[in-house]
């Protein structure tokens, strides 16, 4: 079976209402993307919890609709003109769309083929659970099945956190909290590098399912808890040698007092999910408790780190908030 894919190029303000109209006219699915994606003029849009993007679509948005060919009862040649006429009746005067035929595929196999083992630093390998591990006796292999959770190791923010962990020389028996853990990849890596105990938390129940499954696959002792479970691992009096949060700049700032409150005196914090242009603002927020700095930059993203100062330890809030979900 094949599907009919139609791609309309429209202005930002037209994208969402056009998508709704196409669904009303029988589209199986609709996606909106940057028409310049992959090119020089590509314009990233980021939405963070508590902070909406300045615009909701791109100046030139590609609206892609997928149709079942069986909906075309009037013959192939008439389908697009009739669709355009129907759209015109509800206020859309559009040029004919690009058209493609999408063949039915084994979508699971296709998706899996897009993930390959990733080497990070000298020793860490992120290996999809359906791939064989590399033949390297010194490799620290992280078998990951992301499911619906963020964290496959391919994104620069995750990559930076893993690289930070690999380059630390004294992790044995250091306690670590992975805040907003997603697939659990950072917590699992920390456990394999010697951290103990290791705790991961995320507001998303699907992330907990993926993270616990990944911990089992990797034979690692990591505890994953939801923030509303009342776990002692998240109690105000429980502190950690390392607090790691790979979320986004706005929630990192909003949750700064709670994150700092989870740090032991002299403990370290690692913050990722921050664009290079946002680094100064995040650093300013955390400077009331520690002296944060940019540890490393990759593809426009930065990883920040810092150590809790003794004279500022008591200024952090004791209220521990739920981690924000990361959206990509």
Swiss-Prot record:
Keywords: Cytoplasm, Methyltransferase, S-adenosyl-L-methionine, Transferase
UniProt-listed SUPFAM superfamilies: S-adenosyl-L-methionine-dependent methyltransferases
Its EC number(s): 2.1.1.-
Superkingdom: Bacteria
Entry binding sites for S-adenosyl-L-methionine: 158, 180, 202, 246
Subcellular location: Cytoplasm
Pfam families: PrmA
Its biological purpose: Methylates ribosomal protein L11.
Name of the protein: Ribosomal protein L11 methyltransferase
Species in which this protein is naturally found: Polynucleobacter necessarius subsp. necessarius (strain STIR1)
Gene that this sequence comes from: prmA
């Amino acid at each position: 079976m094949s599907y009919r894919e139609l791609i309309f190029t429209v202005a930002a303000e037209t994208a969402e209402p056009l998508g709704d109209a196409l669904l009303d006219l029988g589209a199986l699915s609709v996606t909106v993307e940057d028409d310049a994606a992959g090119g020089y003029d590509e314009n990233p849009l980021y939405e963070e919890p508590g902070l909406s993007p300045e615009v909701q679509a791109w100046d030139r948005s590609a609206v892609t609709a997928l149709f079942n060919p069986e909906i075309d009862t009037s013959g192939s040649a008439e389908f697009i003109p009739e669709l355009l006429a129907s759209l015109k009746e509800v206020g859309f005067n559009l040029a004919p769309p690009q058209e493609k035929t999408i063949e039915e595929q084994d979508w699971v196999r296709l998706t899996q083929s897009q993930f390959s083992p990733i080497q990070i630093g000298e020793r860490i390998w992120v290996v999809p659970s359906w791939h064989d591990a590399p033949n390297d006796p010194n490799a620290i292999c992280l078998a990951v099945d992301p499911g619906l959770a963020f964290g496959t190791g391919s994104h620069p923010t995750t990559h930076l956190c893993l690289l930070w962990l690999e380059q630390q020389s004294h992790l044995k028996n250091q306690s670590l909290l992975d805040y907003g853990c997603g697939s659990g990849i950072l917590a699992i890596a920390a456990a394999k590098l010697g951290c103990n105990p290791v705790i991961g938390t995320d507001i998303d129940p699907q992330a907990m399912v993926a993270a616990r499954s990944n911990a089992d696959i990797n034979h690692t002792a990591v505890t994953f808890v939801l923030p509303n479970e009342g776990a002692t691992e998240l109690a105000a009096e429980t502190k950690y040698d390392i607090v790691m949060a790979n979320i986004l700049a706005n929630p990192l700032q909003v949750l700064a007092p709670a994150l700092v409150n989870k740090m032991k005196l002299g403990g370290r914090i690692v913050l990722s999910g921050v664009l290079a242009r946002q680094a100064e603002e995040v650093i300013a927020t955390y400077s009331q408790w520690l002296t944060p700095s940019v540890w490393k930059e990759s593809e426009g993203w930065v990883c920040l780190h810092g150590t809790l100062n003794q004279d500022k330890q008591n200024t952090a809030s004791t209220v521990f908030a739920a981690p924000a979900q990361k959206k990509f």
